[in-house]
Amino acid sequence: MSGTILITGATSGFGQATARRFVKEGWKVIGTGRRAERLEALAAELGQAFHGIAFDITDEDATEKALAALPDGFRDIDILVNNAGLALGTAPAPQVALKDWQTMVDTNITGLLNITHHLLPTLIKQKGIVVNLSSVAAHYPYLGGNVYGGTKAFLRQFSLGLRSDLHGKGVRVTSIEPGMCETEFTLVRTGGNQEASDNLYKGVNPITADDIANTIYWVASQPKHININSLELMPVNQSFAGFQVYRES
């Protein structure tokens, strides 16, 4: 099995690990991200099988131009992995800057919609696969995760709705919903506080970027008559939080 896969957010974490896994398996990989220097480093590592394009997926015009400029050998995209996303801050809603909420919505939702919409004709032609990186936060709320969880719930429902809209086209759509994962994502969430980021995972043995890359490859490797609607995974040391109870004095 081989083909062409486009991965958003390929400059670190899940995206970078997925790029490495698919190149190893003989695929051509298009990696997107904002940090051109990281894409260049990944291209130097992975060779001609990797094509990096630096642009902002929240910008519709930039997205259209970047996809239109793809080299001929990378145009027939078989898999889209919507991985780009972020969480900003750990504070409860009254203490959050509105711009952080807007940034999460723009990146996690608007950017995903831009690139998915532009690639749908190709994915239909190729009878391809759309993999959306959601989160267990789509199901289970946690303190400080209000808007982030809301964006991931959108992704999950969008995945199910997109599959319904593409019924009969041979396109598969999967929502992957990880629990605690240790990547650069958490360092962004904590505003660059390495100690706070490390403490979140202390003693947890969290999911790794390679675990998610292997999961995405497994989804893509299923027979064409099977669609994985959603896939929820957690570290063994993470389970479901109990309800909060406020007790009046």
UniProtKB/Swiss-Prot annotation:
It holds the Pfam family adh_short. Substrate binds at S135. Its EC number is 1.1.1.276. Transmembrane segments: none annotated. It comes from the Bacteria. The keyword NADP applies. InterPro entries: NAD(P)-bd_dom_sf, Sc_DH/Rdtase_CS, SDR_fam. The keyword NADP applies. One of its GO terms (molecular function) is serine 3-dehydrogenase activity. SUPFAM superfamilies: NAD(P)-binding Rossmann-fold domains. It is an enzyme of class 1 (oxidoreductase). NADP(+) binds at residues 6-30. It catalyses: L-serine + NADP(+) = aminoacetaldehyde + CO2 + NADPH. Keywords: NADP, Oxidoreductase. The active site is at Y148 (proton acceptor). Belongs to the short-chain dehydrogenases/reductases (SDR) family. Catalyzes the oxidation of the hydroxyl group of serine to form 2-aminomalonate semialdehyde which is spontaneously converted into 2-aminoacetaldehyde and CO(2). Also acts on D-serine, L-glycerate, D-glycerate and 2-methyl-DL-serine. Does not act on O-methyl-DL-serine and L-threonine. PANTHER family: ALCOHOL DEHYDROGENASE. Homotetramer. This is Serine 3-dehydrogenase. The gene is sdh.
